[in-house]
Amino acid sequence: MAVDRLDIDMKTLEDNSDLRQVEFEGEVSEERYQFAVQYDVLEALSTVAPEGDAVAIFRQHLDEIADLGVVALARDPDQEIVVISENDLD
């Protein structure tokens, strides 16, 4: 059985500093979803506070975020926006 993969649409990356998350769209198993990764996750991955550089940090950790997105989606596939939080880290 093939493992689901999150294909992130890089054109949709948006830093929502008010909510402290980077929002984006992605596709898993040919279905499109809205995602957001919290700043806390970006900081845990990079060991750097993401203020002002959140999208750059996101790009540096793209593969890890894609993996975490699949985990977050499996946790609750019916969310309007799938939020990747520290709970999704190993």
Describe each region flagged by the PLM.
Residues M1-E27:
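Short, charged/polar N-terminal "headpieces" of proteins
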Residues Q21-S46:
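A short, structured beta-strand/loop element
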Residues A2-R5, A49-D90:
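Acidic, low-complexity intrinsically disordered segments
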Residues D7, T12, V41-A44, D88:
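Residue-level preference for alpha-helix termini and adjacent loops
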